[in-house]
């Protein structure tokens, strides 16, 4: 049985979320395609909010 790949946009969102938790700037977005870039930035914003609200302890 083949494993199904995750959706490209979901991966972009997750990578953005993790980048924010690691303290990376939103300027470091690796995606050039508009949809993927928007998802990455959305994930980055969520990650930044989670980081500032809960602190890093919740994610280590």
UniProtKB/Swiss-Prot annotation:
Presence of keyword Nucleotide-binding: no
Domain of life: Bacteria
Protein's GO biological process: regulation of translation
Subcellular location, principal: cytoplasm
Cellular component terms per the entry's GO annotation: cytoplasm
InterPro entries: Ribosome_modulation_factor, RMF_sf
Protein location: Cytoplasm
Keywords attached to this entry: Cytoplasm, Translation regulation
Function: During stationary phase, converts 70S ribosomes to an inactive dimeric form (100S ribosomes).
NCBIfam families in the record: PRK14563.1, Rmf_CrpP_fam
Homology family: Belongs to the ribosome modulation factor family.
Protein name: Ribosome modulation factor
Gene name linked to the record: rmf
């Amino acid at each position: 049985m083949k494993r199904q790949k995750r959706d490209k946009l979901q991966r972009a969102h997750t990578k953005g979320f993790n980048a924010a938790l690691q303290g990376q700037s939103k300027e470091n977005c690796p995606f050039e395609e508009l949809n993927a870039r928007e998802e990455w930035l959305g994930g980055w914003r969520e990650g930044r909010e989670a980081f500032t609200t809960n602190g890093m302890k919740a994610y280590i």
